[in-house]
A protein has these predicted regions:
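A short, solvent-exposed, low-complexity linear motif enriched for acidic/polar residues
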Residues: 19-229
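Sec-dependent N-terminal signal peptides
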Residues: 6-11
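C-terminal motif of bacterial Sec signal peptides marking the signal peptidase cleavage site
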Residues: 14-17
Length: 229
């Protein structure tokens, strides 16, 4: 039986419309501590030690689906929901998600004053080290107290990592289809695994505290995990 051209066109339009509407994925970045969601400013615990993270800023770079980079760099402010949700184009299924933790070496040479204020690398984000002429990768500030209570005689915490040698990457082999929702989870307890909250609470990636920055950076790949919903 013959089908007329007029009867075929509506079907073709329907399938075309459905396909175009799904040529993307959404990416959500979540914070957890030992697998439990938390918010910046909430008191957390490692054993008897109380921890309060008061600022969590970081960069992710070269976010790729399969072999194609979809975002060259994003700035994440854990107190700004908009900076933790992204839409990435994807027209066909891929089997890998990859990204860098920090700013890649090419972007790390950029001048922050050359960008508009809404750009991830803008000086407005206060992530640039003028003394080192490069970006901080992770900027995490807070307080710890071995007594188990934040508020009196707290010890300051400042984990500021940067420099090209501290850039880390991660690849996850996972099936991703257009229309999927991706959740990238950052477990901050994994970040400080093996790091002393008594003696290793300060690093600006300088010579005298560089070993702490290396520890934190080496923990980053294990601290991030991806799931597809």
């Amino acid at each position: 039986m013959r089908l007329s051209l007029l009867s075929i066109l509506p079907l073709a339009f329907l399938f075309s419309s459905c396909g175009n509407g799904s040529e993307q994925v959404t990416l959500e970045i979540n914070l957890v501590h030992n697998g439990i969601p938390f918010e910046v400013g909430e008191t957390l615990y490692k054993g008897d030690t109380a921890i309060k993270f008061e600022l969590i800023h970081f960069y992710l770079s070269e976010i790729a689906l399969g072999a194609e980079v979809k975002e060259s760099v994003v700035f994440v402010n854990a107190q700004d929901s908009a900076s933790m949700h992204y839409t990435l184009p994807l027209s066909k299924k891929v089997d890998q998600f990859s990204f860098g933790m920090g700013v890649d070496s090419l972007n790390n040479m950029q001048d922050p004053t050359s960008f508009d204020s809404n750009h991830p690398l803008s000086s407005a984000n206060a992530m640039y080290w003028s003394w080192a002429t490069m970006y901080r990768f992770f900027k995490i500030d807070g307080r710890v107290n071995a007594t188990g209570s934040i508020g009196v005689d707290d010890q300051l915490l400042a984990w500021h990592t940067g420099k090209n040698a501290l850039y880390r990457t991660k690849e996850t082999n996972i099936n991703i289809k257009p229309g999927a929702h991706l959740v990238l989870t950052f477990d901050i307890a994994e970040l400080y695994s093996g790091v002393s909250l008594a003696t290793e609470t300060m690093t600006h990636s300088m010579v005298d505290d560089y070993a702490i920055a290396v520890k934190l950076s080496d923990n980053l790949p294990a601290a991030f995990s991806l799931s597809v919903q």
